[in-house]
Amino acid sequence: MDLNERKIVVDLETLSTHSNACIVSIGAVLIENLEIVDTFYTNVNGVDGKKAGLHVEKDTLDWWQEQPKEIRDAWQRDPQPLDTALDSFSNFYGGSGSIWGYGANFDVVILESAYRALGKDIPWKFWDIACLRTLMNVLDKRLPKANNHNALDDATAQANMLLEILKS
């Protein structure tokens, strides 16, 4: 792995745990030359995802209801249409670099499902996908305890962990 290549760490908040979950927020951090150089955050209109056939799960909705109101309110502020959110994320991704999720079968897979649901091209290649959780498990690393469920805050914590690992 080229340590200086672009790396995009992404985190989502969703209304399901399925691979085709409805997205309500996208947070991402861009790393270049082992430094955080940019961030991305957008709330997403969940109704658009549902109309596109993305999954909403009762258990996840119930779980969200148990979270503090300010957490739920955060991703309901100024939601963008799903189409706009994905186009904005594609622009942020920039067409090259690895894309890192915290779990091999969650964030990146769900984003890909959303792109497909709208008939959009996925901006990365399958070989660009990397899993931070797997890397952390191999190295016996743990993320600091947090419970904010904010996609950008979580992506930032994950990016900082990735940098810690890459710099060691």
State what each model feature region is.
Residues 3-8, 13-101:
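Conserved non-catalytic scaffold segment of RNase H-like nuclease domains
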Residues 72-73, 90, 112, 159, ...:
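Non-transmembrane alpha-helical segments in soluble domains
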Residues 123-142:
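Short, flexible loop segments at boundaries between secondary-structure elements
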